[in-house]
Amino acid sequence: MIGMLTGRVAALGADELVLDVSGVGYLVGAGARTLSRLEPDQDIVLHIETHVREDAFKLYGFLDDIDRAWFVHLQNIQGVGAKAAFAILDTVPVSEIANAAALGDKSTFARAKGVGPKLATRIATELKDKAPPTGRSFSIGLPVHSDDGTTGGAPVAPAGGDSLAREDAVSALVNLGYNESQARQAVAKILRDADSEAPLGDVIRLSLKELAA
């Protein structure tokens, strides 16, 4: 299986790109949000999700591994394929997806193109009590991709920092005796309304206040 590709953008399409890796062109499917951050001849690192079927071998690429993790997580739900998963990720930031999942907020998922009311309800219902994905942690420094398409050389932190902080807060509340589902909903409400950079201690304190209300 292929987990990561490093190369140069040789061509961009409506829903895919060709990545030149040492002279070999890999055709990689990608969402609109990822493609909008790329330019021809740009050197990039793509986190890859590989789908293998009897009649197809498909690569899907992401600039951030937490997006790849959510792409996989969403497709565990009946009726959600690659197209619907990309539509959700293109419409809703992963931090907002995590909040919507914890709160069972179907309206967030219904914003995605091609996701109707029934599917949005199923997604919200099935994700509500599931732990969100955190992505893979890499021991090497990867380029930092900014939204304007530029690439820096600084190492990045392990993927899914927001998800890891969320899990730490939920774990702390569970250790204090709260039900995991209640803890997830409380943390989601705080992260939705508060500064996403709020210290973990503040998130736990505000979540406790929410649970006591």
Curated annotation (Swiss-Prot):
It is found in: Cytoplasm. It comes from the Bacteria. Residues 143-160 are annotated as: Flexible linker. It holds the Pfam family RuvA_N. One of its GO terms (cellular component) is Holliday junction resolvase complex. Keywords: Cytoplasm, DNA damage, DNA recombination, DNA repair, DNA-binding. GO terms for biological process: DNA recombination; DNA repair. Residues 161-213 are annotated as: Domain III. The RuvA-RuvB-RuvC complex processes Holliday junction (HJ) DNA during genetic recombination and DNA repair, while the RuvA-RuvB complex plays an important role in the rescue of blocked DNA replication forks via replication fork reversal (RFR). RuvA specifically binds to HJ cruciform DNA, conferring on it an open structure. The RuvB hexamer acts as an ATP-dependent pump, pulling dsDNA into and through the RuvAB complex. HJ branch migration allows RuvC to scan DNA until it finds its consensus sequence, where it cleaves and resolves the cruciform DNA. HAMAP family: DNA_HJ_migration_RuvA. Has three domains with a flexible linker between the domains II and III and assumes an 'L' shape. Domain III is highly mobile and contacts RuvB. Homotetramer. Forms an RuvA(8)-RuvB(12)-Holliday junction (HJ) complex. HJ DNA is sandwiched between 2 RuvA tetramers; dsDNA enters through RuvA and exits via RuvB. An RuvB hexamer assembles on each DNA strand where it exits the tetramer. Each RuvB hexamer is contacted by two RuvA subunits (via domain III) on 2 adjacent RuvB subunits; this complex drives branch migration. In the full resolvosome a probable DNA-RuvA(4)-RuvB(12)-RuvC(2) complex forms which resolves the HJ. Belongs to the RuvA family. This is Holliday junction branch migration complex subunit RuvA. It comes from Maricaulis maris (strain MCS10) (Caulobacter maris).
